[in-house]
Amino acid sequence: MRADFSVLLVDDSKTQLAHGRSLLQQLGFSRIQLASNGRNALRLMAAGGAPDVLVTDLEMPDIDGVELLRVVAEQRLASAVVIVSSHESAILTSVDDMARQRGLRVLGVVQKPLALTDLRTVLERFESPTDIAEESSPMLALSAADIRRGVASREFILHYQPKVTTTGGVLKGVEALVRWQHPQYGLLSPASFIPLAEESGAIDELTDYLLDLALTQLQAWHAHGLAIAAAVNLSAKSLPRLDLADQIAAATAAVRVEPRFLVLEITETALMADLALSLETLARLRLKGFSLSIDDFGTGFSSLQQLSRVPATEVKIDRSLVHGAAANPTMQALLKNIIDMVKKLQMKSLGEGPDNEADWRLLRDLGCDMAQGYYIARPMPADNLVEWLKHGTKHLRLASGLTGRH
């Protein structure tokens, strides 16, 4: 992993600070700063600039970790944060959600005492393609005209992250994740331009273009014998379009890809915000044979009754409920309830964000159908997928107790 970025470690315990610094040094980091509480951390950041990664405890005197995160978010004092605590999972989940809602790039939540493997896992996300996808760049001077020009110039590209079965790691599909190769700003994440596209009305043009990209790639894979599905994110702003289902069906037919190989994803929160408005389009898409996936499930407080009204084929459980769940009995109980509920509705379940073997095994043992996360593979260009299939799934088969070729 890269170890050339700066880290600020905040903890009121001298022992924990020394331990954390030792772990960071073992990982190859040299640009390390230490602070004994939130106020000292803010002074350091004011004097020396924002660190690349802030690693902070929560319970501290004077300014605690929660207040520190709020100030860091308001003043944009860190590129990314790691939350560390020995508190129960409910508190950690709330703080994690609060930080993300404030626009912070949360690499992960780690239980104390810090372990080398856990710290390595979260810090690796700072450089990963998936983490790039979560980055927000609110200061960029972008406009709807820029997005339309980018579409016309084919500056938007797709990377693909594998979705595999938890029993053997068999590839079933990929999620198409958009990036913008901007001529001035470089590679931009969706957070940098999707909100603007939605607000300005440019989202439909962008969505149509990305669907064409994904379908063209599916056609190429299928022609070479790789019969997998591809998932494309659908904005809630697009759902009221009366012609959406017909247009997607026409685009699929044009490249001779069967509708069942295209999965359309929409987040739980966006879906439930105006379920009545969405249901007509979703029903028509299902009637035409397309698969529907509810993304980020577990963050929007949907009830079983609400979920049963959606003609979805798949539920993607949010990574905040999956990451670290193997060491968290409360999260395990939540996961089990969601997976069991999804089974009762005769949908497929997919766990997002397993970053280690323990979380991967937990998803398998709880009966989750599929998984998608760093432990499996990071998002990759389309050309890399076949090579990954040859060499990248061995650890999944071993973790599943399988040894032969599958």
What are these regions (language model features)?
Residues 5, 14-33:
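Two-component/phosphorelay signaling modules centered on CheY-like receiver
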Residues 11, 57, 318:
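Active-site residues of response regulator receiver
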Residues 12, 34-43, 65:
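Helix N-cap/capping motif at the beta->alpha junctions
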Residues 49-55, 82, 312:
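Active-site beta3 strand of CheY-like receiver
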Residues 67-70, 74, 87-108:
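Alpha4 helix (beta4-alpha4-beta5 surface) of REC/receiver domains from two-component response regulators
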Residues 87, 109-120, 236-238, 265-273, ...:
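EAL-family c-di-GMP phosphodiesterase catalytic domain
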Residues 125-157, 197-201, 242-245, 279, ...:
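C-di-GMP signaling machinery
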Residues 139-256, 270:
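Bacterial c-di-GMP phosphodiesterase EAL domain
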